Design a protein with these regions (language model features):
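Extracellular glycan-associated modules
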Residues: 1-162
């Protein structure tokens, strides 16, 4: 079986600064399958995507005065905010938010975790299959959202924050 995956980043990226990954058409919709999730009233385009994004995050324990970014929820990873992974260092809180509707930019918290393991590699997998978004943390399914339709065009991936 041929591996159809694409490596977007092959080295460590620090999250104390914003890094934008230019992906330029690396994820494409399947033109042969018209699809719009059921119950979706505001989606004008039809989308059918099947993809997975795997990433490893290592968060060091730092004192609260390390950076202003530690005092607020700071993006660790964002794929056009569909989803966006945020971390608040002062309270060791982690959350995943996303825009559930293409026509409404309101963000919804779909997962929250207190006490994310520090000084340990945490493995995240974002799996999208024709309207269902599954997110795994360290091999455990933590989110499964149905009827989600991300708009994927030439979107960039953001890692870290200023």
């Amino acid at each position: 079986m041929k591996n159809r995956g694409t490596i977007l980043v092959d080295k460590a990226i620090y999250t104390n600064k914003e890094t934008i990954i230019q992906r330029k058409n690396k994820i494409k919709k399947n033109p042969d399958i018209p699809y719009a999730p059921p119950k979706s009233k505001s989606i004008k385009k039809k989308h059918d995507y099947n993809y997975a994004i795997s990433l490893w995050l290592y968060i060091d324990a730092r004192p609260p005065n390390t950076s202003y970014a530690y005092e607020k929820f700071t993006p660790l990873f964002s794929y056009r905010k569909m989803p966006e992974m945020l971390y608040k260092g002062t309270t060791n809180e982690f959350k995943i938010m996303m825009q559930k509707d293409l026509m409404n930019e309101q963000m919804h918290t779909i997962y929250k975790k207190k006490d994310l393991p520090l000084q340990k590699w945490n493995h995240f997998v974002i799996n999208y299959d024709s309207g269902t978004l599954d997110i795994f943390l360290n091999n455990e399914l933590v989110v499964s959202e149905k009827n989600v339709s991300p708009k994927i065009e030439n979107e960039d991936i953001q890692i870290g924050s200023k």
